[in-house]
Swiss-Prot record:
Keywords of this entry: Cytoplasm
Major subcellular location class: cytoplasm
Native source species: Thermoanaerobacter pseudethanolicus (strain ATCC 33223 / 39E) (Clostridium thermohydrosulfuricum)
Family: Belongs to the UPF0291 family.
Gene3D superfamilies documented for this protein: Helix hairpin bin (1.10.287.540)
UniProt GO cellular component terms: cytoplasm
Protein name, UniProt field: UPF0291 protein Teth39_0326
Pfam families: DUF896
Domain of life: Bacteria
Subcellular location: Cytoplasm
Amino acid sequence: MITREMIDRINFLYHKSQTEGLTEEEKEEQKRLRQEYVKEIKERVRRELESIKYANNSCEHCGHDHHHHHHHHRH
């Protein structure tokens, strides 16, 4: 889970890397934190998309008359 501390730490490491540079340990930590962060964001996006997809599906069955689609078929 993304916490405030995690974001603060990512920012801290980023700024330190821009100013004085990071130790090997800090570089590893930064890489881990970023991977965790990206993974979490992707999960959130996936959940969002799924909930949107389900919302759209339920709309199709909300009682509208779909017979008007049939005039496109040639007999």
